[in-house]
Amino acid sequence: HGSGSSRFSPRNTYVAEVLQERGIGTLLFDLLTREEDQDYATRFDIDLLTQRLLAATAWLRSDPKTQALSLGYFGASTGAAAALQAAAKMEKNISAVVSRGGRPDLAGAVALGRVTAPTLLIVGGADYGVIELNQQADALMNCEKRLILIPGATHLFEEPGTLERVERLAA
């Protein structure tokens, strides 16, 4: 998830539940502690967020129950930037990346160019500043990718039916 959010947010738990209903295992966790999340600068420390995501990935890979499973990342806002940076570092070990209202630009041009996992960038059609950032990131990526705008949706996809469209696309 992204800045100012948590694993307990209704949007995050809803998407995780829908993915689980469709047979996709999920691990929903916070990239920052509560204290760290209070610091605005830390919320945008993409290198730190990426390190935390890579640590969680290593933990999953070390468990005999999960080590052989395909792994994908689903990130929102700054969490999407961390997902893309981590996917670039993990190369072919990540099967897919989904960004919901993400800030892929914060991953950096080099990382975006190194992502090999198929990537889905989902942006609200009324999230004007973020649309352009996703279009620019999309142009820098060399992997199989798709940018989808959800008509009428703002950054948090709070409008009726918009989050449901996100989960259908992600699954």
What is each model feature region?
Residues 1-69, 156-161, 165:
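Serine-hydrolase catalytic machinery in alpha/beta-hydrolase-like enzymes
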Residues 128-133:
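Conserved alpha/beta-hydrolase "acid-adjacent" motif
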Residues 3, 77-80, 126:
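Active-site loop->helix "elbow" adjoining a glycine-rich segment at hydrolase catalytic centers
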Residues 64-77, 97:
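Alpha/beta-hydrolase fold nucleophile elbow
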Residues 115, 121-123:
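Short beta-strand/loop motif that positions the catalytic acidic residue
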Residues 73-87:
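Glycine-rich nucleophile elbow surrounding the catalytic serine of serine-hydrolase chemistry
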Residues 92-104:
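A conserved short beta-strand
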Residues 140-156:
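Catalytic histidine neighborhood in serine/cysteine hydrolases
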